[in-house]
Amino acid sequence: MENKNQKRFVLIHGVCHGAWTWDKVKTQLEVAGHCVTAVDLAASGINMTKVEEIQTLNDYCKPLLEFLSSLGSDDGKVIVVAHSMGGISAALAADSFACKIAAIVFLTAFMPDTINPPAYVYEKLLRSIPQEEWLDTTCVNYGKPDFPLQYTLLGPKFMAKKMYQNSPVQDLEVVKTLVRENPLVTNNLAGTRSFSEEGYGSVTRIYIVCREDLVEVEDYQRWMISNFPPKEVMEIKCADHMPMFSKPQEVCALLLEIANKYCKN
């Protein structure tokens, strides 16, 4: 029998990670009776694209855009949940498929506005972090010399100290074997044209603040919220940059609350 209360979630991972990031949350949402798709962006997870093949933000987000394009009117609207750099991917998707999205949930994610270039919020944070704080994270230029792009690989020490400090140690050990080189969403990758008011700007947004994030620190998350106010702000205490590992039950509970409130399929 069809579950009339079933919601459809689309989960977007952050830089260097993959769909596997969401395994704990995905399982809990499915047990609650919902349909969940966690997407591997290009050159992420099991997606076979090479990072050097990614020349634009559209290239990087191609798997997400193709999935949303495949949804028909019978599928109902989806709740897009974006983590970290995935917030910029979610905004791009909303610009093309606003009519298919009930809401975007930014889980300690970069939340672009509709005035500045897509990479504005990321590059603002980047300027505020001293180079030495990236520890063993590497960053490499690729592409054309006169139009350089960049990819990164998060270092084990950086992940342990800045990203997973409240998460189970055994989870981090697995993560170290799964992260891949990913493009950084710079102005050269994303372009300088802002996301549109009629597309991305028309979609309901909810921001979940992670109080103990040491990458996108709470003050910075609050700045993004004031820069482009969402419909609602929630928070998770004691959550690090990876709340799907440090606080999966709390993440799931908030997503279910959001789905019931904002998705009326």
UniProtKB/Swiss-Prot annotation:
Q: What is this protein called?
A: Putative methylesterase 6
This protein's source sits in the domain of life called Eukaryota
Enzyme type, top EC level: hydrolase
The Swiss-Prot or TrEMBL record describes its family as follows: Belongs to the AB hydrolase superfamily. Methylesterase family.
> Which residues participate directly in catalysis?
84, 213, 241
Q: What is its EC number?
A: 3.1.1.-
Q: Which InterPro entries match?
A: AB_hydrolase_1 (IPR000073), AB_hydrolase_fold (IPR029058), MES/HNL (IPR045889)
One Pfam assignment: Abhydrolase_6
Q: Does the keyword Hydrolase apply?
A: yes
Keyword field:
Hydrolase
Q: Where are the transmembrane segments?
A: none
The organism of origin for this protein: Arabidopsis thaliana (Mouse-ear cress)
Function, as annotated: Putative methylesterase.
GO molecular function (one): hydrolase activity
